[in-house]
């Protein structure tokens, strides 16, 4: 395993630890999820480039599309919660009922 792969895996694990530690605030959870998605994108791109598997070239692009959708939905939820309750606590999400 090369140094680049180890750095990407360490970035993923640090984002996962951050998500587990700072899960009370929605903004912190969204930032940790974005870090995880970025490290997954980097790892997928490196793996495909190193293995010369040309059929899977679209996988990192599809992962980026899902990450952008996740970020947009997360930010919309963050704005909705902060406008409604004035805080970004994840506990406020239980109060959002239609």
Swiss-Prot record:
Gene from which the chain derives: MT-ND4L
Tree of life domain: Eukaryota
Locations listed in the record: Mitochondrion inner membrane
Enzyme Commission number: 7.1.1.2
Keyword flag tRNA processing: no
Family to which this protein belongs: Belongs to the complex I subunit 4L family.
Name of this chain's protein: NADH-ubiquinone oxidoreductase chain 4L
Pfam families in the record: Oxidored_q2
């Amino acid at each position: 395993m090369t140094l680049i792969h180890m750095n990407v895996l360490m970035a993923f694990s640090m984002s996962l630890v951050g998500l587990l530690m700072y899960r009370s605030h929605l903004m912190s959870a969204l930032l940790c999820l974005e870090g995880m998605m970025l490290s997954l994108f980097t790892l997928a791109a490196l793996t495909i480039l190193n293995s010369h598997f040309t059929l899977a070239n679209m996988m990192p692009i599809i992962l980026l599309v899902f990450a952008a959708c996740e970020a947009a939905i997360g930010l919309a939820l963050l704005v909705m919660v902060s406008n409604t309750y004035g805080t970004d606590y994840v506990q406020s999400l239980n109060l959002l009922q239609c």
